[in-house]
């Protein structure tokens, strides 16, 4: 199932995506003059931070709306899938990705492409959803969808691997894994809370429902999660778990 993006909703409800990326940016340690590919660059806010290091950063995103938003920030970005990158062999010193790889359906094809466009010894540094990511949200959403005969939709959205599984996959693609960590990261949500998170990050699921059912699913899922994911002040804290790694081609 393809996820669709509303860039305005993403900017409003997904600021934490780039705001909490300091850890993986630190692992990348971009250097002036390096050629870096940012896979799934989104609206380009994090890509801008990378360019500020003096690195030569190229963005790529499969969403035409996200690619267009990144271009308004002055980012060089191509619209293409991670499974078919429009770049020459060995073109980049590093490939970077934040909060994007779990959306990629063809993981093995993506890894083969990353390995191809990296120079020998180049690094692949990324953070993505890991095993257990938004588990409570997914269970609640699946339960509500199942009431209406659509319980399989959520299972088609994302890939949240264990460190062991992803290490094995990277090695099969020819990488040498240097670091791999699974990191729990409780994440405060924006003012719209869980309802806006669902409308933004599960838009692909909701778009596959009959129109009259979409808001009912949002409301019922939000109600199920209220006791588990709201704090004493009523703020929503999503149960994020990140998988962060460094691998060498």
Indicate residue ranges for each PLM-predicted region.
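C-terminal helical/coil "lid" or tail adjacent to the Rossmann-like core of SAM-dependent
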Residues: 173, 178-233
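A short glycine-rich, Lys/Arg-flanked "PGG" loop and its adjoining helix->strand segment in the class I
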Residues: 108-123
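Core SAM-dependent methyltransferase catalytic element
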Residues: 243-249
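Short alpha-helix
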Residues: 159-173
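Class I SAM-dependent methyltransferase SAM/SAH-binding core
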Residues: 35-84, 94
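Conserved class I S-adenosyl-L-methionine
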Residues: 1-34, 45-49, 66-69, 123-148
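A short SAM/SAH-binding and catalytic strip from SAM-dependent methyltransferases
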Residues: 94-107
